Amino acid sequence: MAKSTTFFISLTLPFLLLSVVTATYYQSMSPTVLGFQEEKFTHLHFYFHDVVTGPKPSMVIVAEPNGKAKNSLPFGTVVAMDDPLTVGPESDSKLVGKAQGIYTSISQEEMGLMMVMTMAFSDGEFNGSTLSILARNMIMSEPVREMAIVGGTGAFRFARGYAQAKFYSVDFTKGDAIVEYDIFVFHY
């Protein structure tokens, strides 16, 4: 009997100690403890200007594959961007922020991108706030592309939602594009 009790204690004691140690690094809490009130739902609408041409391009290719290319963004191309976000499609329209990040050409068969970008807002109610997108963007095969909003900062803390993107205008020869964005996001 003593041997089985000793065995049982030696088997359960590490689990008990582990559960005590594990429980010390987190706690469940209500969002109101951090000052978060009722969750909000926001719709944003703006235009994204991806400009290759001119004296001050907003995107640059930082890596590209060797060999012949079938299109302007062959598989494996990596692009860095600092694209203006504006109220209207015109380049001189009111600036509301920047889309900053990278995208990579991810498909050998069709024009597809992996977008890793932060939309940093610089005007109005959301000045200083950001939304982060991490998503596949099949720019040629889907007229309206849907991308995941995976987080945010400032007014968009705990953000989750999706972005819909569609070409407003695109010049495939030069590489310049204006993309219309509709963003639907839950946040506190």
From Swiss-Prot:
Catalytic activity from the UniProt record: a (4R)-4,2'-dihydroxyisoflavan = a pterocarpan + H2O; (3R,4R)-7,2'-dihydroxy-4'-methoxyisoflavanol = (-)-medicarpin + H2O; (3S,4R)-7,2'-dihydroxy-4'-methoxyisoflavanol = (+)-medicarpin + H2O; (3R,4R)-3-(6-hydroxy-1,3-benzodioxol-5-yl)-3,4-dihydro-2H-chromene-4,7-diol = (-)-maackiain + H2O
Enzyme class: lyase
Signal peptide range: 1-23
Biological processes, Gene Ontology terms: defense response; phenylpropanoid biosynthetic process
Activity across pH: Optimum pH is 6.5-7.5.
EC number from the UniProt entry: 4.2.1.139
Sugar-modified residues: N127
Compartments, as annotated in UniProt: Secreted, Extracellular space, Apoplast
MF terms in GO: pterocarpan synthase activity
Chief location bin: secreted
GO cellular component, one term: apoplast
Subunit structure: Homodimer.
Family recorded in the similarity comment: Belongs to the plant dirigent protein family.
Identification of the protein by name: Pterocarpan synthase 1
Species this chain originates from: Glycyrrhiza echinata (Licorice)
Gene behind this protein: PTS1
